[in-house]
Structures are given as C-alpha cells and as structure tokens.
Amino acid sequence: MKQRLLIILVLISSSLLLATGNKNLEKALRLLKINSEIIIDGKIDSAWNYADSTTNFFQFEPYFNQPTSVKTIAKILTTEEAIYCLMICYDDKNLIQANAGMHDGYTGDIVSIMLDTFGDKQTAYKFAVNASGVISDSRMLDDARNRDYSWDGIWQGTSQIYDWGFVVEMKIPYKSIKYDKNLSEWGLDFDRWRSYNKEDIYWCEYEQSEGQRISKFGKLIFQDFKPTVT
C-alpha cells in the first residue's frame, strides 16, 4: 500500500514539474490552407476569416505576468507557397510610435512571428514589421540566447495604421527558409513591443529570470498540409 502511494505521489510530482517547466504545452494554432494568395497591404481581407487565431497574450515587461494594457490578435494561414501572418494591434492612434527606421532596425512599435522550423527547440526564424512597415529579420540561436542579425530572408511585410490601432501582414515563402519536411508541427511564438510604455508582450509565457526560450514555444500544427517547396 505504501509503495503504491509512493508511486502515485511521484507521478503527481512529475506532472507538476512538467506543467511548471513549460506553461505553453497546450498553446497551439492550426495552420489551415487556402487556395488563393493574400495581398500584403495591411488590410484585413475576408480570407482571414478562415484562419486560426489567438488573443491570449501575456505581458513580460514592464509588469511581469500582468494583463496586457492593449489587445492583440494574431492569425496565421498558408498556401502551397507561403505562410501568411496577420497581427491586429489595438491602441490609441496617438500613442503608436511609427518610426520609419531602417531594415533590421527593430524601432518603434513592432510585432514579430517566430518559427522553429526544425523542431529542435534551439533555433528559429524571427520576422518582424514595425508600425510604419519597415521589416526586420534574424535567426535565433542557442535556445534564443543568441541572434544572427546578418541573416536576411526574402519575404514581404507591411502595416497600416487606423484610428483604433494598426495592422501588420506578412508573407513568408517556404523557399526562403529551411525546414524539416517530415514534421507535422513547428514551434511558434508571437511578440509585440509597445514603445509608449516599453511593454513587451508574448503569446507564450516565460520565466522572468530566463526570458524568451525556443524550447518553450507553442505549436503550429499543419492541418491536412505539409510544405514541400524548397
């Protein structure tokens, strides 16, 4: 009886440790396929109605693990040729910092999508667009402890500012990245930086002492589709 009780306690403890170690195990979006391309113009086309989406974002800074001060919606779709990402960022128009900036400058209000395309939980691509439509990209290395800013992909991104906030659209061709064709899911995270109050907002939750970690990304699940373009 004691041995059985001990086994149960060990199993419960292990489950609690796993849950504590990665709060993002249940975070997942389905990558649904559409047949027509989306025009990258910062306007919300009807095709986005078919996309899986999330509003479940968390504040990392300045107030760790507190509710975000603004609402963010992220959506994702695919065609045979490319992944499409839409981010709807609600805000007071007068508080949006739309700095023109330079490529790879990461300036002003900016949103990002990060993709672990090999499922190794150590490397990922990062694609970012600021509120004025300037794009930036990089490779995340060593579980996001290091960055390779020299990497430049061939992809599209733009933004549009509205009275209620701004919209970012991205198109990432599969031929512009490397990936494991055998995988049915990739690692995924979204990020939003709000310059006005220096607020860093993530889809996934991280430990304050560590910061963002690829090993704790959520999932992007390929729904009846796997990319084959190289």
Task: Give a label for each model feature.
Residues 2-10:
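Sec-dependent signal peptide recognition
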Residues 10-19:
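Hydrophobic h-region of N-terminal signal peptides that target proteins for export
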